[in-house]
Amino acid sequence: MRVKEIRKNYQHLWRWGIMLRWGTMLLGMLMICSAAEQLWVTVYYGVPVWKEATTTLFCASDAKAYDTEAHNVWATHACVPTDPNPQEVVLVNVTENFNMWKNNMVEQMHENIISLWDQSLKPCVKLTPLCVTLHCTDLRNTTNNNSSIEEKMKGEIKNCSFNVTTNIRDKVQKEYALFYKLDVVPIDNDNNSTNTCYRLISCDTSVITQACPKVSFEPIPIHYCTPAGFALLKCNNKTFNGTGPCKNVSTVQCTHGIRPVVSTQLLLNGSLAEEGVVIRSENFTDNVKTIIVQLNETVKINCIRPNNKTRKRVTMGPGRVYYTTGEIIGDIRQAHCNISRAEWNKTLEQIANKLRKQFENKTIVFNQSSGGDPEIVMHNFNCGGEFFYCDSSQLFNSTHLSNGTWWNGTGPENITLPCRIKQIVNMWQEVGKAMYAPPIRGQIRCSSNITGLLLTRDGGNTQNNNTNSSIEIFRPGGGDMRDNWRSELYKYKVVKIEPLGVAPTRAKRRVVQREKRAVGIGAVFLGFLGAAGSTMGAAAVTLTVQARQLLPGIVQQQNNLLRAIDAQQHLLQLTVWGIKQLQARVLAVERYLKDQQLMGIWGCSGKFICTTAVPWNTSWSNKSFNEIWDNMTWMEWEREINNYTNLIYNLIEESQNQQEKNEQDLLALDKWDSLWNWFSITKWLWYIKIFIMIVGGLVGLRIVFTVLSIVNRVRQGYSPLSFQTRLPARGPDRPEGIEEEGGERDRDRSGPLVDGLLALIWVDLRSLCLFSYHRLRDLLLIVTRTVELLGRKGWEVLKYLWNLLQYWSQELKNSAVSLLNATAIAVAEGTDRVIEILQRTYRAILHIPVKIRQGLERALL
């Protein structure tokens, strides 16, 4: 019965135990689940994230492929060599916004081209001495009697004479030169006279600089490149209009080769559209905005200056040579350009169709320029070193009806554009700067490809209700070279790579024993931008490979830039490109060091995935873990937490500082753990070495003391008979001391030669300690005595100086008192005498009436 009762009681307890066990398991599972939901901030290095930015671009070019003797204006010899295998990484599932009208690359290119143009003219000759009166007549014939002048060229060339200073400054001689009519203006406004006074056209507003003889204006393709840490996004949509989102995006380090062709109305030798003609404008409804047309097929334009010129030198003083046209050999004919009429009409029809779609099926009319500067009214470009101004009215003289029919008149197979030539040009519409292009010998021929147009739309028609409301008139435009560069740079934008990313994970940083790690981090940013369209989880797998490309790419780019800078050392000054390259070098290193500095501050040096102890706050983003890592790209995630990035960075820094402080405190407590290392077997060899050194030192010390003892005994006239040292007999005058007295044993007493290693070590150590003690005691006594003597002498000197000071102080006091007394006595005596004199004078004055009365009395008596 007793057993059954106990069994029943234990069954009750067993039931409670099972319930307790299940409760504990459930509580543990709940704790694990709750712990699993806790997310922590993790730092990732090498994430495919970028932001729009503006930075200094540098150039790359194949300058060696062109004439090495002629110095081209664009200074492409100072550029970095182009990459023979340029990388272009397609960004899948990426949509990016572009805006060609607000692209800093256009402004940079415009400023660079102007600066290069100005810099190429700096060492050239200023033609200020030519700003004199020119006596000009129309060129009627040449030295060849069989030659003739074309009717259109009559009056186009002026034969002018003028006075210039020779090599001797006070001597003037008469020279002559041929000028184009566009380059001179009459002074007396008399155009009918056969011999009129003229002046150069820009003398009243600008400083004219002659282009150096070997300067070439041939456009060489320039590739604009971004420094390390930046990249170019390229839109590959074939019908991209320049603004808005682009879904076919790739990333490159450099642009394609852009020829810096300076022209108006027609865009020459540019890039073509891949699918049909493309028209682009910032605002089609605003007639002030220029319309940029990109063709899909080129139209050939062949130009010629048939005149065979000679060039002569005119000296304008010491060190100044002016190049002018000497004479024209053969017939004098007008320069002109030829364009295929069929190709041009086909191109205009395609452009009209695009414009008709944009402007609601209206009739499209192309008309000539409405007026303005010659650069705007005519098609202006450079052909073989001469600046052509061609009349383009024949190109823009057609009507395209809304039903698809058009009218352009009839004519020969080719359209011939008459061209005039100017030698004095005012480039870039800048005030105060003009350039004189020296004449080119012989005939000039050039062939170009028309790849685009610059158009302007007449305003006002769409707002009227008359019959012309359905007509849109377009005229050739240009003049702002930014539109020329924009027609090539429309597909690019500069972005700044942001390789640092933060995201929530379930991993928390643990404090472990830290070991040194040497991790090489590597270079080109384009490699890891390839994962931009992937989800965050897929992109994080390739972080190591992507980040390792960073540093080698920077180093390679730096080496290329240095080689380009070295190529300019023979010049006295860097070109614009040299300065850009130096800026790019500094910028690349600065970006890399900045990122590495942040990684170091966060305790993540050498890591690509770095956990932290900062808990993730759901207020930053309330998306779930799976939603973040499985559905979002890094770019989307960056936009999600962009407002909290700086806050997260600060929290990571504070957490790292606290962790380092905790580690320092922990290491201070763990110092005692190092005591157990003394008993490690790896330390035994070191202990044996120390023991051997101690024994060797003691043996050497024993030998030294023995030799010193023998020498001391020999000096006292005693020679030991054996190694057994006997105790000397003591006389009554040298008591050893008794037990009650407790006196010290005599130092001259010696002990027997002991046996055994330990006894020998003990005796030697005792002897060493006693020897050191006695010597140190003697030295201390000597020092004490010396200090005592010096103190006594010093005290006596101080007392003597004090007494001397007191004596002289008393003497000075007595002297001062004596001087004061003498001065007081002298002053008192002087004062008494003055008072006495005053008293006598006063009495004398008082006695004057008495004396007078006494005198009168005597006189009366």
Curated annotation (Swiss-Prot):
Region of interest: Fusion peptide: 518-538
Chain segments carrying region V1: 136-159
Q: Where do the segments described as Immunosuppression lie?
A: 580-598
Where does the record place the region V2? 160-203
In this entry, the parts of the chain located on the Extracellular side of the membrane are: 38-690
Q: Where is this region: Disordered?
A: 725-749
Q: Name one GO molecular function term.
A: structural molecule activity
Would you tell me the protein name for this molecule?
A: Envelope glycoprotein gp160
Q: Which organism is it from?
A: Human immunodeficiency virus type 1 group M subtype B (isolate KB-1/ETR)
Starting at the broadest rank, the lineage of the source organism is: Viruses, Riboviria, Pararnavirae, Artverviricota, Revtraviricetes
UniProt gene name:
env
